[in-house]
Amino acid sequence: MSFNASTSDWAGYLANEPWAGYVERVKQMPASRWAILALVNAPVLAILFNALWQKIAPRKATDPPVVFHWLPIIGSAIWYGNDPIGFFQTCQERYGDVFTCILLGRKVTVTLGVKGSNFVLGGKSTAFNAEGAYTHLTTPVFGKDVVYDCPNEVFMQQKKFIKFGLTTKNFPRLREDDRGRGGRIYAQGPKEKEVREGLNKSFSQLYSDLDGGFTPLNFLFANLPLESYRKRDRAQKKMSDFYVDIIKRRRANPDAETHYDMIESLKEQTYRGGAALRDHEIAHLMIALLMAGQHTSTATLAWTVLHLASRPDVAAALYQEQVERFGNADGSFRAMEYEDLRHLPVLDSVIRETLRVHPPIHNIMRQVREDVPVPASLAAPSSKSGNGVYVVPKDTYVLASPIISQLDPRIWVNAHTWEPSRWSDSAGVAAQALRTYTDEAGEKIDYGFGAVSKGTESPYQPFGAGRHRCIGEQFAYLQIGTIVAALVRRVELRLPTKVPEHNYHTLILMPKDPKSVHYRRRRFD
């Protein structure tokens, strides 16, 4: 049918159309068509309603500002998951240091900056609970009755037991074997050998399967009918049995040649009530020690090697320090001892700068067990919203992100640049941040695992702060320093590309691909 676009023609055309039958046709539409329409339109309506509700819903004056999000339930999870640092920095500019975001149905209040970290990490465990935030992730991997699968006061005692086994008197046992070109690093002693001999290829596979339980998916869902979850559970059982068998053999033969290792140390420990650690608790603590320490050290080593390969000048200074301190007349090197690490400023600066730019854990979360007011010095409602304070409500979550302070250009010069020399300036920001973090001359707090500096008010917190500060901090410096020194003694490093960006799709902050490093041996034996 042809017609022109005049008003009279349109009126005649529309008058002849059977509009009255339209309703009847809709009524006769099959149910499958209705289902398709509902399936297509329901998400759109949900998104529109969610956006509208955020604009018109009444909000308490004490509620922190909420990050606008289009997708209900999912909230800001996609943006946060792909680029948490960019997400936090953008929200910080828009909302300030305190704001709330929705992450897959969880209401999470983020507190940024030095004061924000102090608010969360320095808070009381009765208010900010780590167990509620992480037990669903750690318990299937570590095992029952340890770490976050027990009351906080019990966990603090367990940290004390492990810390006792990691005292500096045991550090000299870790040293480099220079008798072969491999330069292997290991702990000495017959009973450590008993454990090492069990670390064969099958154990490596168990470790890999158990490591598969430390992913963002596992953080979101503790149990799913997936093969990776089944492998995780089987590996946890076999690895636990491995350690329990060693413990039982030692208990059955107490007169055998002994050497002080971590298992032996844990066997001697007792809780405050006098109860000794049970065999499965020792086994699960050994798994926790293995898994927790390996991830963070591996990440730090990877970033250190990448940066040394990209900065030949720093690598050369590091090598020269090794020559001056440990070089022999024939061009070889003597082995490093623990005390030597205290006198290697270049190596120390390299490790500290790597931890500043690439802290293994960039976000720390807690479950809120009671309503907690936010200090006005951190953030407060504007005069238009009221004269009170923000309150983080019970049964939600709080999140601190120390990396935001560690990369804050208002604190650090060239904040995003890896520059170890900043740590050699005794009057600089880095040295001051380190003094605040270690606070060697200040007041110490005993959270239950020995007196430590609080460290929550420093802009540099690579090992956490407060009651959950990492107890393996000194051991990590020893381990990383020994491996880096062994590496630069043997090879020259070059990076064919730029230093990779952060991979935020892993729980630990690892580099993205490609991350290949070229090397050349310094000498051939």
Please identify what each model-predicted range represents.
Residues 3-43, 102-109, 170-184, 190-201, ...:
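Cytochrome P450
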Residues 358-363, 382, 400-450:
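Conserved cytochrome P450 K-helix/beta-meander segment immediately N-terminal to the heme-binding cysteine loop
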Residues 25-32, 81-109, 130-150, 159-189, ...:
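Cytochrome P450 catalytic-domain "roof"
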